[in-house]
C-alpha cells in the first residue's frame, strides 16, 4: 500500500541523491512531510517553483532568522496544549501532524523533535475552558 504521507526525501523520486544529501542537515532538524498531490503540483524543472519552495526543505532554513515562536504564543498558553489569546476563542494543540509541513510555518517549532507543546491529554485544557 502506498503511504498517505511522505515523511522522508528518500520517498520523493524527483529529488536526486546529491540534493537529498545536501538537505539532510535541514531534515535532521526540521521535519519533512508532504503528499503525492502537493508533489504533483511542482514543476521540477524550476528550482524556484513556488510549490517546491513551499514544500521541499531549503538550506536557508538553517540560517539564523528569528524566533521559533514569532507570534509569542507562549504568552497565551493557559494549560498544556491550550492557547487563549482572544476573549471568545481558545485553541487546543492536540496533534503534531499536518498535511504538509510548509517550510515557512510559524508553528514550525511544534514539529521539531522533542517539542512538548502538543498535548494528547486534553483534560487540563478542557478544565480551563469550563
In which residue ranges do the predicted regions lie?
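Flexible, acidic/Gly-rich N-terminal and inter-domain linker regions that tether
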Residues: 1-85
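Conserved Radical SAM active-site core
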Residues: 56, 68-93, 103-130
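Short pre-active-site segment immediately N-terminal to redox-active cysteine/selenocysteine motifs
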Residues: 97-101
Amino acid at each position: 500500500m502506498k503511504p498517505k504521507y511522505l515523511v522522508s526525501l528518500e520517498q520523493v523520486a524527483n529529488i536526486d541523491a546529491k540534493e537529498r544529501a545536501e538537505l539532510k542537515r535541514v531534515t535532521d532538524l526540521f521535519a519533512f512531510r508532504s503528499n503525492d498531490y502537493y508533489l504533483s503540483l511542482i514543476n521540477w524543472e524550476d528550482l524556484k517553483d513556488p510549490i517546491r519552495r513551499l514544500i521541499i526543505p531549503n538550506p536557508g532554513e538553517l540560517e539564523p532568522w528569528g524566533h521559533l515562536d514569532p507570534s509569542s504564543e507562549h504568552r497565551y498558553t493557559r494549560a498544556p496544549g491550550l492557547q487563549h489569546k482572544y476573549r471568545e476563542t481558545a485553541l487546543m494543540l492536540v496533534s503534531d501532524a499536518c498535511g504538509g509541513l510548509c517550510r515557512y510555518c510559524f508553528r514550525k517549532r511544534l514539529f521539531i523533535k522533542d517539542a512538548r507543546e502538543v498535548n494528547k491529554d486534553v483534560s487540563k485544557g478542557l478544565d480551563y475552558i469550563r
